[in-house]
């Protein structure tokens, strides 16, 4: 109460911050007449002037006002669009490294140009992050007109580019791309062996579009580069046959936590089935050697009980394709990890693909926190403001709309069953369609969108076939005639190719669009339809300019007329009076786009995103959610109380309860889920930070090694540290000479360093100390390496040392990642022993890291002491086969996006007959099998001789 009163008197913190920008907005506006008088060349020259001012010591803040004014003028001349005052405020928020929350249709894409241009003047590169390739291409092509006019270059990073194209795009002043592409490029760069092969040039400033989707929905899901393991398809198919043999009493399903566990009876049954199939090792299912089997049994159970076809995934062309729960889009190429995707393939009886091993990974949380400055834009971030500040130190600033929002958000209607709910939705669609009001129906899954589509078909509606040319002609013709066309479009993962087109035309009179959640986000729905989209579609192939101009005028007239029809599609409703009260009241509900939600999402933000599609730039609109007690949110989070309430109210079949209390109760349930998900993300981040700290050390060290012309000093330090550890192990400090393990030391020197030294003789010398012993061994090892340098020359040796060091580091780092994953999976059990799992994880991860570094010293020293160089020419080190993938934001399971990367061409050398090989000339050997005898005549296998480091 007191807080509300204070806000009334003094305004909220957000209001005060927005007011604080007004002086600079006024200053920018004051420059407008002056800049309007400049010629194009004079306006373009301002970029060089700004750069000169920065070089003289001015800051970006010092030149913000003239720079923003310059961008506004350039936009007017190139795009015909002028930044509103509120858009200038949005640009300042972005420049300050915060989140600008702007409603749909307020021009976020144009707002970004202000902060992008200003920060690009620093010459360090600005990254604009979008959610898909289509938006990256669209926004870059559109906004590059402003940047190009002002003398700045623009690049685009999308799937399918090679490294040379990526490097050029990153070298531009401004780079547009998707969050996945930026993250994968960072991981791939840190697997390269030469600096010149790296494509990114640093992380200075990023503006993230749809920031809530990327930094929250996908926050806990890592980007992963992986390599394939052995094929085990028969094993998965065998395991899959066991699940149908189980009864529901054999396992417990927890939908809230998305887990399934075997009961005691289920374990016994599975044990018997495994034993009969010859898959059980030892006596019990829970013997150590069966850990992997138990894991895959659980994954098969999850595949059958928690994952539903056409909701979580679809089967297309013999492949299981994941569906993104937030957008309803297909994610071709992405795969669940830990054997879950293989379990789904076995369940659906399609070809089981091999599993993968993690080679490198990073979460978006840790990737985006690397930027010196990070900012974001979205229409819905206020509900997650605490999390965005807590994790990313980003404040959410709500930017006022240019025109007041005129959308009517109605109370939810709650029905007992889904059948009743769908009947009510159908009736509402028919009423809206009769007055030509366009309707967008949001669904939570493909399955639900197709149930609704089936309902519409049963009642005489026809689905638009977007595969045919001019698919919307009938809809346009009906709108011109002022009659309902009874046509509908479905936008889900099955029809994602036409996504932008379907969404853009969802504002045509009489249009009915069924969309899975926020599919099509990033494309505005304009009342009357999209001028750009229709011109693109309807003038394609017209070469005569006069004919083309006439067609464009016809389209413009069409859209203006359609807009008027939609604005007038109001509904007049008479509200029945309560007994004994005044006569019935008449209410006029607005026209515009009508949003119908078919169920509530776990997150209020996703619901707000759906609502926000209507009411853009002051247009009228309305929204309403239709719910049932059988909906997932209601069923999992407390429908029992609502059910008993409806029973007490005597609610009949087909009747709904509509009351603000219901909305508040649902909002509280959503807040609980959001708080739980925030805690999960925060906890996961604490664990991921442990790996992230180690990742930064390794990646920074790799870059330093590549930058160094010679790593000889590093190699010598590693060799000396290893020898020191070896001597300390066998010759303990303060021990008597007779207590020394001389034989063990001599044996390890031979095994690791490949040198035989008279250590036993040295140990017998009078008064010899361990320091003297250490010094002699180091001297002999150094002389051995110096001889190799003398034999091959310093240039060759520098290359060999760097290559072996980087390759060994990468190999051990990959093994270390696997160890950390295994540790992470079991560390939670420490909580039962009253120990903090996070502290235990930190401690053990550090111990593993130290062990890896010690192993690195030994492995690099051993390889360099034994290496023999065969080829005369320099060869690139060969990277393992790699695939890029990312994890599902809803379930927390890894989805793997197979983007096969071949960074080094494979050798095409052919085998050469033994008699044609010269033992002293490796260039005559051709391709030698690893297990063949080495052609040099040593008697060793090739892999243990010249083939070891060739």
UniProtKB/Swiss-Prot annotation:
Its main location: membrane. One of its GO terms (molecular function) is metal ion binding. It is a peripheral membrane protein. ATP binds at residues 87, 105-109, 524. One of its GO terms (cellular component) is cell envelope Sec protein transport complex. Belongs to the SecA family. This is Protein translocase subunit SecA. It comes from Bradyrhizobium sp. (strain BTAi1 / ATCC BAA-1182). The gene is secA.
């Amino acid at each position: 109460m007191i807080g509300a009163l204070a806000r009334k008197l003094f305004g909220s913190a957000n209001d005060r911050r927005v007011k604080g920008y007004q002086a600079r907005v006024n200053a920018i506006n004051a420059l407008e007449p002056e800049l309007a008088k400049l010629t194009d060349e004079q306006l373009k020259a301002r970029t060089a002037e700004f750069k000169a001012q920065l070089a003289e010591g001015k800051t970006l803040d010092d030149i913000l006002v003239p720079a923003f004014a310059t961008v506004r003028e350039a936009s007017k001349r190139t795009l015909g669009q002028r930044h509103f005052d509120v858009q200038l405020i949005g640009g300042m928020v972005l420049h300050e490294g915060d989140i600008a929350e702007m409603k749909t249709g307020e021009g976020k894409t144009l707002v970004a140009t202000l902060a992008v241009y200003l920060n690009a003047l620093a010459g360090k590169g600005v990254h604009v992050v979008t959610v898909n390739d289509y938006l990256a291409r669209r926004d870059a092509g559109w906004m590059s007109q402003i940047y190009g006019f002002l003398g700045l270059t623009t690049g685009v990073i999308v799937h399918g580019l090679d490294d040379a194209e990526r490097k050029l795009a990153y070298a531009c002043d401004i780079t547009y791309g998707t969050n996945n592409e930026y993250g994968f490029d960072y991981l791939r760069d840190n697997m390269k062996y030469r600096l010149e092969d790296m494509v990114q040039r640093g992380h200075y400033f990023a503006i993230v579009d749809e920031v809530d989707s990327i930094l929250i929905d996908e926050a806990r899901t890592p980007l992963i580069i992986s390599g394939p393991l052995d094929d085990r398809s028969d094993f998965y198919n065998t395991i899959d046959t066991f699940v149908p043999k189980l009864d529901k009493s054999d396992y417990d399903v927890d939908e809230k936590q998305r887990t399934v566990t075997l009961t005691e009876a289920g374990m016994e049954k599975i044990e018997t089935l495994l034993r009969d199939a010859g898959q059980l090792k030892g006596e019990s299912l829970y013997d150590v050697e069966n850990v992997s089997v138990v894991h895959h049994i659980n994954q098969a159970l999850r595949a059958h009980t928690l994952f539903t076809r056409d909701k979580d995934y679809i089967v297309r062309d013999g492949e299981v394709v994941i569906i993104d729960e937030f957008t309803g889009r297909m994610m071709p190429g992405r795969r669940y990890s830990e054997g879950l995707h293989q379990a789904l393939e076995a369940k659906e009886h399609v070809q089981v693909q091999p599993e993968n091993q993690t080679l490198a990974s990073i979460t978006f949380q840790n990737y985006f926190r690397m930027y010196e400055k990070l900012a974001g834009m979205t229409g819905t971030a206020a509900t997650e403001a605490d999390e965005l500040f807590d994790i990313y130190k980003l404040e959410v600033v709500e930017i006022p709309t240019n025109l007041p929002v005129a959308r009517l958000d109605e109370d939810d209607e709650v029905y007992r069953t889904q059948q009743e709910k769908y009947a009510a939705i159908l009736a509402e669609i028919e009423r809206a369609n009769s007055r030509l009001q366009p309707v967008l129906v949001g669904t939570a899954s493909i399955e639900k969108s197709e149930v609704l589509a089936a309902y519409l078909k049963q009642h005489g509606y026809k689905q638009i076939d977007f595969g045919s040319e001019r698919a919307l002609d009938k809809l346009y013709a009906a709108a011109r005639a002022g009659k309902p066309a009874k046509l509908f479009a479905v936008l889900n993962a099955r029809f994602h190719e036409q996504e932008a087109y379907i969404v853009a035309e969802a504002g045509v009179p009489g249009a009915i669009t069924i969309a899975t959640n926020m599919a099509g986000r990033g494309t505005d729905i304009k009342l009357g339809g999209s001028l750009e989209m229709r011109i693109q579609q309807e003038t394609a192939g017209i070469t005569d300019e006069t004919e083309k101009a006439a067609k464009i005028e016809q389209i413009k007239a069409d859209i203006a007329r359609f807009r008027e029809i939609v604005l007038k599609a109001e509904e007049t409703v008479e509200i029945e009076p309560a007994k004994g009260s005044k006569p019935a009241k008449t209410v006029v509900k607005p026209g515009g786009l009508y949003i119908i939600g078919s169920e509530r999402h776990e997150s209020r933000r996703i619901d707000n995103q759906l609502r926000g599609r209507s009411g853009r730039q002051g247009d009228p609109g309305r929204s309403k959610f239709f719910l049932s007690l059988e909906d997932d949110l209601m069923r999992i989070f407390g429908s029992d109380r609502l059910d008993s309430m409806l029973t007490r109210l005597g609610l009949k079949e087909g009747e709904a309860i509509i009351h603000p209390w219901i909305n508040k109760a649902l909002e509280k349930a959503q807040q609980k889920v959001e708080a739980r998900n925030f805690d999960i993300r925060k906890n996961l981040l604490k664990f991921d930070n442990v790996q992230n700290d180690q990742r930064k050390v390794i990646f920074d060290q790799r870059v330093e090694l590549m930058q160094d012309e010679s790593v000889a000093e590093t190699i010598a330090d590693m060799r000396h540290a290893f020898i020191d550890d070896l001597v300390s192990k066998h010759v303990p400090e303060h021990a008597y000479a007779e207590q020394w393990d001389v034989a063990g030391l001599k044996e390890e020197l031979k095994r690791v360093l490949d040198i035989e030294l008279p250590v036993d003789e040295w140990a017998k010398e009078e008064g010899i100390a361990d320091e003297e012993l250490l010094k002699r061994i180091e001297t002999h090892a150094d002389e051995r390496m110096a001889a190799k340098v003398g034999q091959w020359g310093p240039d060759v040796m520098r290359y060999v040392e760097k290559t072996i060091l980087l390759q060994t580091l990468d190999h051990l780092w990959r093994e270390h990642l696997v160890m950390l994953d295994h540790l992470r999976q079991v560390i939670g059990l420490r909580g039962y022993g009253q120990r903090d799992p996070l502290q235990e994880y930190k401690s053990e991860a550090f111990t593993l890291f130290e062990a890896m570094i010690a192993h690195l010293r030994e492995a690099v020293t051993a390889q360099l002491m034994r290496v023999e160089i065969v080829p005369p020419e320099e060869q690139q080190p060969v990277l393992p086969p790699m695939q890029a993938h990312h994890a599902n934001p809803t379930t927390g399971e890894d989805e793997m996006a197979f983007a096969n990367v071949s960074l080094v061409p494979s050798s095409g050398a052919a085998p050469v007959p033994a008699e044609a090989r010269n033992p002293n000339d490796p260039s005559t050997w051709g391709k030698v099998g690893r297990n063949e005898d080495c052609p040099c005549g040593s008697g060793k296998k090739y892999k243990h001789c010249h083939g070891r480091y060739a």
